[in-house]
A protein has these predicted regions:
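Minor-groove-contacting beta-hairpin "wing" of winged helix-turn-helix DNA-binding domains
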Residues: 89-94
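Generic signal for short, ordered secondary-structure residues
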Residues: 55-57, 75, 106
Length: 114
């Protein structure tokens, strides 16, 4: 039997937010190794300009990132063991890094932006 998609039952906003946190964790401009083995500490979050923002080479619609500033989303992700919130930053746990949201190709756009 194939693995269940979204086994933790994350809602769409939580899935989008985790997808963005996973991408931020891949980039040294936004992250560094965490204290826990396999975790990544996020050192900052991107700021939107207009209707989008950049995560490295990817362009993301601001509407897909509303969860980055939503305390309820962070609380849910933390409760499910995917992140640890340590304001003003956060740690994405190994479980959070490995969780397949299925949205990476949907919300991260790799177009040229000038």
């Amino acid at each position: 039997m194939p693995p269940k998609h979204n086994p933790l039952g994350l809602n769409p906003l939580q899935l989008r937010t985790l997808t963005l946190l996973q991408q931020l964790a891949r980039l040294p401009d936004y992250s560094q190794p965490g204290e826990e083995a396999g975790s990544i500490a996020l050192t900052r979050l991107p700021h939107p300009h207009g209707d989008h923002f950049h995560i490295g080479e990817a362009v993301v619609s601001s509407r897909d990132a509303t969860g980055l500033r939503n305390p309820a989303v962070w609380a849910a992700l933390e409760r499910k063991g995917l992140v640890r919130s340590t304001p003003p930053s956060a740690v994405v746990t190994p479980r959070g890094l490995d969780y397949d949201t299925g949205l990476r190709e949907t919300i991260l756009h790799w177009a040229d932006h000038g």
